[in-house]
Design a protein with these regions (language model features):
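Acidic, mature catalytic/reactive cores of soluble proteins
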Residues: 1-595
């Protein structure tokens, strides 16, 4: 079974996916949204990769160096054993600055014996467009593509460079290194320098993980998902949905999208999760990104580029075969043109936490207040209109219940912020508007025929997003309507241990895969309505659906439990953390002994 058995490494500038046999099959340089250098993930023949060739007698196992994002792949045979430690340098270089170069180290550590290997270095820059040439110099191997001759990469190594290019077999007799850099290095690189980079990066990750709150159960699960979320954050505070593009929701279908952008919804949920377990710095950086990006215009979008870009035009790369033959391969995402009324609810919930717990300086508070007013003017003007919803349908807009609920959240949180700042007129106005939304949802969203809230005002379909009505405070768990909705959603959408997000037809047909995050939403919903044992059993089952490193993509196959969709996905990992916290915090409460 192909379970997306990749590890991820990165440094908040870019990231790489490395297979369970140590082959780099996805890497964009110099940034997350740059063209790929290796894209075998999307085309085995053309995409390019960077790996190690060993005989069939070698056993290979992979794990993370504990508490870090340094990936270890160990090759073992009778003749010898070696370990490849993959990482991207990431550490504080000055008092307030971090060193985040566009480069990747492969530290080859000799464990025992005299293992034999060959380096398979096959870059294919610019999404494998153009002819590739490798030029060997005394210092490095230079990669150049005919598609853009100014875009180059440099491979440094303690191994003979001609042996690398010619893929000759090498007998490992000591520790060696490979360094792939987007820039030509200004200082000489040797094994001692590499070890310094390794130690600095190791210390950085250990310190970062140490700031994550600790729990008596599921701590390892929480920690790994938090490390993934950190890798999905750009250094300016933007948060990516995933580091990949065009991994299909279902193999062979066309629901293939580029996720290397910052959605307000996804990012707000991710940052709130990071803040909840102790990472205040990530929240502050995101708030600065939001202020600088959204304050530039009142023409709000649901998503932006990682540097705040507004135009994210979608095109296809028709020369690539696609993951497992699933075409098209897309870059860019036309969803940026959509109206999704729910997005600002998630953002306003986070901004409310900002005001409560990390308000910053007076000028920052005032700048944020101006943004709050603009957002809520937008929400007030648009909540009555149809939209594309949380699932970004590409057909006609609808009056989605979850969108109305999140508009209520936006106005409710805005009213609370206004009350905190003693802006009583705004508080009263926004409370009244929020109450109007509540009445509207209760009148048009609840359907007696199905004894549940429905997906939209105009249908009787069920939708997993209805489960969010309780955690965002629209309706209490004790309300019979919420309990009935949870049970109705489970009956309609829970299938073979997993959840559909919805199962009515959309503009691409009927969804055929499970949405990973939605199963975690169901677990939480079952927990809050009192079905604790069922919730915990289902949670433990879901954890087994991760790959060999505990990483999750966006989707799962109902029958095989094979992962699909972009990977690793922020939605899935924030849901892992939030669900694990239900049980971890309960366990800690029960284990607390008063003196």
């Amino acid at each position: 079974m192909n379970n997306l058995n990749y590890g991820i490494i990165g440094n908040s500038r870019t990231a790489a996916l490395i297979s369970d046999r140590g082959r780099i099959e996805w890497l964009c340089f110099p940034d997350f949204d740059s063209p790929s250098v290796f894209a075998a993930l999307l085309d085995r023949a053309k995409g390019g990769s960077f790996g190690f060739e060993v005989s069939g007698s070698y056993a290979v196992r992979q794990s993370y160096v504990p508490h870090t994002n340094i990936l270890s792949t160990r090759f073992s045979a009778d003749e010898g054993e070696f370990e490849v430690l993959d990482y991207m340098p990431c550490y504080r270089s000055f008092e307030k600055e971090h060193y985040l170069p566009a480069e990747l180290y492969r530290y080859i550590r000799l464990v025992r014996g005299r293992p034999r290997l060959a380096i398979d270095y096959a870059p294919a820059p610019n999404y494998a467009r153009g002819e590739v040439s490798l030029r060997v110099t005394p210092e490095y191997v230079e990669t150049c593509s005919s598609y853009d001759r100014k875009d180059r990469q440099y491979l440094y190594s303690s191994l003979p460079l001609d042996a690398i290019v010619e893929r000759r077999e090498i007998t490992l007799e000591k520790d060696e290194f490979l360094l792939l850099s987007y820039n030509e290095k200004a200082i000489p690189i040797d094994i001692e320098r590499e070890k310094i980079e390794y130690c600095r990066t190791l210390v950085y990750w250990l310190n970062w993980t140490n700031r994550t709150k600790k729990y008596s159960c599921y701590n390892d699960v929480i920690e790994r998902s938090m490390l993934v979320l950190k890798l999905l954050s750009y250094y300016n505070g933007a948060m990516l949905a995933a580091v990949t593009t065009s991994l299909p929701e279902t193999i062979g279908e066309e629901r293939n999208w580029d996720y290397r952008f910052c959605w307000l919804r996804d990012a707000s949920m991710s940052i709130e999760t990071m803040f909840r377990v102790g990472h205040v710095g990530a929240a502050r950086r995101f708030m600065k990104f939001i202020q600088s990006t959204l304050s530039a215009s009142h023409d709000f979008q649901i998503m932006y580029g990682i540097r705040g870009e507004r135009t994210l035009t979608e095109t296809t790369l028709d020369h690539l075969a696609g993951y497992a033959g699933s075409r098209p391969v897309r870059i860019g995402n036309d969803a940026y043109r959509q109206r999704q009324n729910d997005s600002f609810g998630y953002l306003m919930d986070l901004i409310y936490q900002y005001y409560r717990l990390m308000p910053g300086t007076l000028d920052e508070i005032e700048d944020m207040w101006e943004l709050v007013k603009s957002i809520l003017d937008n929400v007030s003007e648009n909540w009555r209109n149809p939209d594309k919803g949380i699932w970004e349908i590409r057909g006609e807009g609808q009056h989605f219940v979850s969108s109305k609920v999140m508009c209520w959240v936006a106005l409710d949180r805005g009213a609370r912020i206004a009350a905190m700042l003693r802006k009583h007129a705004c508080a009263e106005s926004w409370r009244e508007e929020a109450e109007a939304i509540r009445r509207d949802v209760l009148e048009h969203g609840w359907k007696e025929e199905i004894q549940s809230f429905s997906q939209s005002y105009g249908n009787l379909a069920l939708d997993s997003s209805l489960l969010l009505m309780e955690p965002y405070g629209f309706i209490p768990a004790a309300d019979p309507r919420y309990r009935k909705t949870v049970l109705a959603v489970r009956k309609a959408l829970f299938h073979k241990g997993l959840m559909y997000r919805y199962n009515n037809e959309d503009d691409f047909g009927v969804p055929s895969s499970a949405f990973t995050m939605c199963t975690f939403w169901l677990i939480r919903a079952l927990y809050v309505i009192g079905q604790h044992n069922e919730a915990k059993t289902l949670f433990n089952q879901m954890l087994r659906n991760g790959n060999h490193l505990g990483l999750f993509s966006e989707h799962l196959d109902f029958d095989t439990k094979e992962q699909s969709g972009n990977f690793p996905q922020a939605y899935s990992h924030l849901a892992v953390v939030n669900t694990a916290l239900l049980f971890a915090e309960e366990d800690d409460r029960l284990g607390f002994i008063r003196p």
